[in-house]
């Protein structure tokens, strides 16, 4: 069941869902707009990406804005730090207004029940023009859904409590035996 604005607000006010900082004007009828932080990360020139090995990414902070060039892929993060209870999951959706400019936001937009942290966004500029993005702008929407029952496993993965634009940790999947 997708949560309405009334339920989202009730859950935030009762601390069932944590959103810091919370801006009530970001609440939509069935979602919460999240804002762009000042942290981005990108992968520097590589011959090949070996997913079994840690991949170094350059993380930078910006004061007011950054420009994403045509065909460029980078990671960004939300300003908001969220914490979901064990009975709520969420979907990250790009904003239509940005999609209409050719900016693709996220390709891994699932937030598991029990997740805590800033959300890393995967950004890609499919336009033939550079796009200027500003710190604090509404960048994506978070749609909350209530699970039919408490799961036997809640999220305790490698991105728990992440802050800032967090590069891939897929190499850790290969360490599991």
UniProtKB/Swiss-Prot annotation:
GO molecular-function terms, A-Z: dCTP deaminase (dUMP-forming) activity; dCTP deaminase activity; nucleotide binding
InterPro entries from the UniProt entry: dCTP_deaminase, dUTPase-like_sf, dUTPase_trimeric
Pfam families, A to Z: DCD
Entry's Gene Ontology BP terms: dUMP biosynthetic process; dUTP biosynthetic process; nucleobase-containing small molecule interconversion
Keywords carried by this UniProt record: Hydrolase, Nucleotide metabolism, Nucleotide-binding
Keyword Hydrolase: yes
CDD domains associated with the record: trimeric_dUTPase
Site entry (Important for bifunctional activity), positions: 109-110
E.C. code: 3.5.4.30
Amino acids binding dCTP: 95-100, 112, 120-122, 141, 155, 162
List of catalytic residues: 122
Catalysed reaction, written as an equation: dCTP + 2 H2O = dUMP + NH4(+) + diphosphate
Gene3D superfamilies in UniProt: 2.70.40.10
Pathway this chain belongs to: Pyrimidine metabolism; dUMP biosynthesis; dUMP from dCTP: step 1/1
Function: Bifunctional enzyme that catalyzes both the deamination of dCTP to dUTP and the hydrolysis of dUTP to dUMP without releasing the toxic dUTP intermediate.
Subunit structure: Homotrimer.
NCBIfam families, sorted: dCTP_deam
Family to which this protein belongs: Belongs to the dCTP deaminase family.
Protein name as annotated: dCTP deaminase, dUMP-forming
Upper classification of the organism: Bacteria, Pseudomonadati, Aquificota, Aquificia, Aquificales
Gene it is expressed from: dcd
